[in-house]
């Protein structure tokens, strides 16, 4: 079984050298690290998929944006290239690359724009879908990771890893309009991750992924630092009682029926290893189910009608499918290191990213048939699909 350290070693072999340095609707991390010390990068590996698992940053300049972004195209954050790659999933061709700030890690498509969390530069880059030459940089704090769009309010919520805050961006103004600070202490007064994942004590909640309640008004924030789920009342801008979470959270979703939260986490070492997808009651926060997936659950997706769920086991390298009753219906080996999972708007196509191998796999969701593998991406992190 791969540990954090052996996984990082494999990454170094695959990449040739290592750069310290990782999701849909409400996008979660693949989170990036600004510039931590070497031991900090190792510690965050277990919690966020290995920010020290990156190949060297490419020195190649992005091509000038050209044609409008057509429905069905993929937008992929290339962490090591500081670009947003636009990809045709059917041919695997990289059509263009757009400068997207330092260490882009998360991507979200909303309201005619592609939003990219530039985790190394404290900004969100907005790219106009109709005219990709229109690019706006929005300053949002220290390290934006989780992205979530509130269509009713016209607001983009941005989780700030190092500031333990949620920033609110007006998507019409393309400007920061408010910041909500999370409480210093989390669930049961936690202030730190477990020993497996701790670098510096008391470093804050460290939000990595967001999900919006379907009725609006409540934002769920999966936190690495206190391995819990903060709940923010958006009407008051105050945090209410937190839920217990998962060690090394990577993604949080509200279930299709609105009754549950689906929480994916990669865990740590020893007793902190995580091989199950956690299902929480959305009202009480009680963990009602632990669904076996495989070592280090790095992502989750659900069909819009709740009829199917998919999850990925990063260290086992498998995509796993379940029915509505959590019966396993299939597994597809894709290779160790898969760390991003997105269901396309068509509900029929899954995109699975491997930031170490520089790949995005295109998979038929109903059958788990591998349709295509896109190569040549520079540490692909967040993935979004133009609707």
Give the residues covered by each predicted segment:
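Predominantly soluble domains enriched in secretory-pathway, periplasmic, or organellar proteins
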Residues: 2-19, 26-387
């Amino acid at each position: 079984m791969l540990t954090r350290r052996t996984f990082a070693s494999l990454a170094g072999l695959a990449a040739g050298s290592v750069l310290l340095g990782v999701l849909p609707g409400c996008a979660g991390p693949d989170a990036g690290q600004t510039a931590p010390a070497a031991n900090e990068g190792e510690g965050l590996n277990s919690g966020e998929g290995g920010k020290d698992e990156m190949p060297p940053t490419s020195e190649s300049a992005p091509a000038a944006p050209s044609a409008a972004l057509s429905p069905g195209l993929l937008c992929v954050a290339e962490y090591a290239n500081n670009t947003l790659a636009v990809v045709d999933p059917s041919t695997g061709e990289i059509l263009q690359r757009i400068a997207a700030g330092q260490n882009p890690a998360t991507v979200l498509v909303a309201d005619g724009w592609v939003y990219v969390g530039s985790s190394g530069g404290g900004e969100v880059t907005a790219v106009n879908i109709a005219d990709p030459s229109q690019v706006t940089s929005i300053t949002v704090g220290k390290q934006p990771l989780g992205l979530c769009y509130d269509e009713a309010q016209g607001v983009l919520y941005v989780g700030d890893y190092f500031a333990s805050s949620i920033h609110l961006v007006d998507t019409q103004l393309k400007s920061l309009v408010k910041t909500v600070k999370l409480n210093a202490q989390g669930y049961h007064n936690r202030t730190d991750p477990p020993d497996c994942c701790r670098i510096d004590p008391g470093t804050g909640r460290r939000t990595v992924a967001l999900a919006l309640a379907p009725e609006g008004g409540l934002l769920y924030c999966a936190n690495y630092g206190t391995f819990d789920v903060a709940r923010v009342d958006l009407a008051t801008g105050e945090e209410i009682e937190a839920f217990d979470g998962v060690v090394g959270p990577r993604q949080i979703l509200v279930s299709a029926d609105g009754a549950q939260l689906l929480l994916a986490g990669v865990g740590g070492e020893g007793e902190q290893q995580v091989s199950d997808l956690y299902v929480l009651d959305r009202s009480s926060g009680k963990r009602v189910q632990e669904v076996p997936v495989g070592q280090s659950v790095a992502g989750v997706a659900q069909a819009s009608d709740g009829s199917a769920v998919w999850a990925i086991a990063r260290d086992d390298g498998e995509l796993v499918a379940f029915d509505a009753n959590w019966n396993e219906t299939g597994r597809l080996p894709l290779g160790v290191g898969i760390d991003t999972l997105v269901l396309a708007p068509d509900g029929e196509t899954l995109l699975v990213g491997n930031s170490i191998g520089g790949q995005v796999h295109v998979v038929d969701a109903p059958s788990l048939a591998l349709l295509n593998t896109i190569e040549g991406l520079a540490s692909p992190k967040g993935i979004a699909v133009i609707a």
